[in-house]
Amino acid sequence: MSMRLTFKGDKKIQKKKKKNTKSLQSSLESAENDPFWTDANELNELEGPAVIYKIDDDAGVSLGIEEVKESCVLLPLDKVSLEPELTRQVFLLSILNNTILLKSCLGKYMSCSKSGDLYCTQEAVGSQEQWIAENLGSGFWAWKSVSTKKYLTLSREKQDQAIACVSDTVIPEAKWRIRVQTRFLKKNKSSLFDNPTIHSRQLESMAGRKLSTDEKKTLKKAFKEGVLHEALLDLRVSSRSDKYG
């Protein structure tokens, strides 16, 4: 029995509860893994899931995919949350030879045709699937096609909107913003553009098939020398010759 004297009006002393370490750790991990979105401001932030968008006084729009024809279209984006509601609005960004690849939710790369039309039908990578992201400052970016040297542009005609690579210069219609997930941001690390690396899975994805050990070595060497595109073309020609020869 406790011999401590108590008086009327005294506040009850509450026993301190031990913190549940596991519960706290779980909460921290959950918070770290939540897909919070933020605008990209540096080149080394362009990795992982991303939303390419524009916003004006009327509404927000983002680059997206039309699932049946696999062409690129504009999709509405909530101008307040700036968060995608459809997987068709999200592209997976990766780096190749100081250029950027944009893979859609369909698992295919965004390409630019000679006429400037955009589509996502290619599983292998060539110059048409490679892009240069130019940092314009203040959160704005311009997307330049490696194959056509033209910029991704939003055009408006009356109530219709369309996208294509048609501009030779960075006009206002060619300025975009990019949303990325905070968990993919690289802190205190050198840019991937300064230290490019490539993995076997990436090479097989670009080649569109499984690769032998020798083929991987050849392509990795070509990547380091900056001639991967040419090496991939040679590989495809060789594969066709073996198939029909």
Curated annotation (Swiss-Prot):
Its main location: nucleus. It is found in: Nucleus, Nucleolus. This is Protein frg1. The gene is frg1. GO terms for molecular function: actin filament binding. GO terms for cellular component: catalytic step 2 spliceosome; nucleolus; nucleus. May have a role in processing of pre-rRNA or in the assembly of rRNA into ribosomal subunits. May be involved in pre-mRNA splicing. Component of the spliceosome. It holds the Pfam family FRG1. Residues 1-32 are annotated as: Disordered. Signal peptide: none annotated. InterPro entries: Actin-crosslinking (IPR008999), FRG1 (IPR010414). Keywords: mRNA processing, mRNA splicing, Nucleus, Spliceosome. GO terms for biological process: mRNA cis splicing, via spliceosome. It comes from the Eukaryota. Belongs to the FRG1 family. It comes from Schizosaccharomyces pombe (strain 972 / ATCC 24843) (Fission yeast).
